[in-house]
Amino acid sequence: MPGMSRHNQSVGAYGERCALRHLITAGLRPVARNWRCPHGEIDIIAWDGPVLAICEVKTRRTDTFGTPTAAVTGTKARRLRLLAARWLAETGTRADEVRFDVLSIRLTGGPPHVEHLKGAF
């Protein structure tokens, strides 16, 4: 990603792997990871029963720059809604319900702490 150091990219990728494991353990069925188009990226797309979950993953080693969930601004939420509509259109996927989740990953020593906020926005 432009503007991100290799270290930050590595931390983010690790956080996404932690989030994916969490979702699978919770019974969700991932269908896409790091889906990209010219307008942005969706970290994880997964089925939670009949509900399609669009998942944004935020990973932090410290809260110096705010909590992971605070990084999901209104602007980011609007972009994710547009990206989800585009993914649905491009893949021809039909979903009666689409939910937007945020997975907050904190890496503060010891095992990662994963918080899954279903329907975050």
Swiss-Prot record:
InterPro entries: Restrct_endonuc-II-like, tRNA_endonuc-like_dom_sf, UPF0102_YraN-like. Disulfide bonds: none annotated. GO terms for molecular function: nucleic acid binding. Pfam families: UPF0102. NCBIfam families: PRK12497.1-3 (NF009150), PRK12497.3-3 (NF009154). HAMAP family: UPF0102. Belongs to the UPF0102 family. This is UPF0102 protein Strop_1320. It comes from Salinispora tropica (strain ATCC BAA-916 / DSM 44818 / JCM 13857 / NBRC 105044 / CNB-440).
